[in-house]
Regions:
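Short, small-residue-biased leader/transition segments that mark boundaries at the very start
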Residues: 1-3
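A residue-level signal for alpha-helical anchor/packing sites in multi-pass solute transporters
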Residues: 6-8, 102
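Short helix-to-coil transition segments within interhelical loops
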Residues: 11-17
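Secretory targeting signals
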Residues: 22-105, 142-162
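Transmembrane helix-loop junctions in multipass membrane proteins, especially transporters and channels
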Residues: 44-56, 109, 129, 133-137, ...
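Junction motif at the cytosolic side of a transmembrane helix
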Residues: 102, 164-184
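Central hydrophobic cores of alpha-helical transmembrane segments
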Residues: 111-124
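Extracytoplasmic/secretory soluble proteins
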Residues: 129-150, 165-169
Length: 184
């Protein structure tokens, strides 16, 4: 329908290839982040409606002794702690959604493209556990990094750098492979 009406030609002629790729990349990242964050926010709001907002008591997992990253912040300022984790989940959601975008330029199979973020997520976990067992390296397993009670101070670099590295690698694949694949 668009080709017959020549509407698509105006779209092609009014935007450059680079701007189109940047818009696709940013849109995919933001949508992936929102897909992860919206259920978390709905859950947070529903919990806040029905559970009293009491300050956490320092016991068990929530000891303020420095064994877990930001546990003092959790005890003292719970909503700031929650906001930081929601932002981190947004960044991870966007990073793994961009993996699917980049893999769509490598594979022609749509089923494989949909599975690539999950394969990457679990693959990082397997590689992280193997390196930890063989060489004693700190874990960069996404499941461990996103669990708020298991994150230690030694993993802060992995916590910050992992989604950035994933996004940069996916962006390079997308911009290099996608530059040859557009009709502009």
């Amino acid at each position: 329908m668009c080709i017959r009406d020549r509407y698509i030609l105006q779209y092609y002629s009014r935007i450059s290839k680079n701007r189109l790729h940047i818009a696709k990349f940013i849109t995919t990242f933001v949508v992936g982040g929102l897909i992860v964050v919206i259920p978390l926010l709905v859950n947070l709001i529903a919990t806040m409606m029905f559970v009293p907002a009491l300050k956490p008591i320092e016991n068990g997992l929530f000891m303020g002794n420095g064994s877990s990253f930001m546990n003092v912040l959790f005890v003292k300022h719970t909503f700031i702690y929650t906001f930081i984790y929601i932002v981190q989940f947004f960044i991870y959601g966007g990073a793994f959604c961009v993996i699917a975008l980049a893999s769509s330029y490598i594979f022609n199979n749509s089923f494989l493209v949909m599975l690539m973020p999950f394969v990457t997520f679990y693959g990082l976990g397997v590689v992280s556990n193997m390196l930890r067992n063989m060489f004693g390296m700190d874990s960069f397993n996404p499941m461990r990094l996103l669990a708020s009670n298991m994150l230690s101070d030694k993993q802060l670099a992995a916590y910050i750098l992992e989604p950035i590295i994933i996004t940069v690698i996916s962006g390079i694949i997308f911009f290099v492979k996608g530059a040859d694949n557009e009709a502009l």
